[in-house]
């Protein structure tokens, strides 16, 4: 399942999660982001245990700034509220598995 993460639910869905959370910073006008969205949907369907959140940088500029997002798509894996891995650009399913391993 892919969650829509905002500044209002970030603490509950991400910081307080005991499971790793994969965050995708994206924008609707970004073509690589759209392709990444398709990859994430497929990944989520085949990995139902994975916690995945999408953050629209245009709607949540504070969160994008907090993570220092300069390019999109940008992916971050957080565990216990701390960034443990990150990647920039379109990622494959295998790369997503590697990020979450």
Locate each region found by the language model.
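A short beta-strand-turn-helix
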Residues: 3-20, 61
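Residue-level signature of catalytic and energy-coupling elements of molecular machines
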Residues: 10, 23, 40, 56, ...
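Conserved helix-turn-beta segment immediately C-terminal to the redox Cys motif
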Residues: 18-20, 37-55, 61
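Conserved redox-active cysteine motifs that mediate thiol-disulfide chemistry
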Residues: 25-38
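Non-catalytic, surface beta->alpha helical segment in thiol-disulfide oxidoreductase systems
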Residues: 77-101
